[in-house]
Amino acid sequence: MPAFPSAIRGMIVGCGLLLAGCASGSDLWVEIGGARYAVEIADDDAERARGLMFRDDMPANHGMLFIHEREQPLAYWMKNTKIPLDILYFDDERLLVSQQRDVPPCTLGNGCPSYPSESPARYVLELNAGEAARLGLEDGAELHPAPAIPVP
């Protein structure tokens, strides 16, 4: 009889560990302008290429953080992106160097325009359109990533 309760105890511990692993997504956030956003990370070519394509919406206080290997001139476009976005470019020091606000969705495929950074950038944060204005973001604002996000 004592083996049964210990087996149940083992199952409960195992389920708890499994659920703890699922909660790790809540550790992925950034702060800017006094606001915190849960983010998805795009840190390889495939993830960066797909970005927020084909999404019908994005919850409030959510975004996507694109991490590039090095600081460089960057340009993003809205190909197959159904929601308007603010595109915020940050340098190696995670300082805001360029903003493209209220960028409209584009369904023109390869005919969609690109939205370049005004200075070299390494990190790009895409938020729902209007967030940069709501926060009153100005160039030089600092991006603060969660400790769980792999940035140097």
Language-model region placement:
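N-terminal secretory signal peptides that target proteins for export/translocation
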Residues: 1-5
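Compact, glycine-rich, soluble single-domain proteins
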Residues: 22-152
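General structural signal for secondary-structure boundaries
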Residues: 7-8, 44
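Bacterial N-terminal signal peptides
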Residues: 9-20
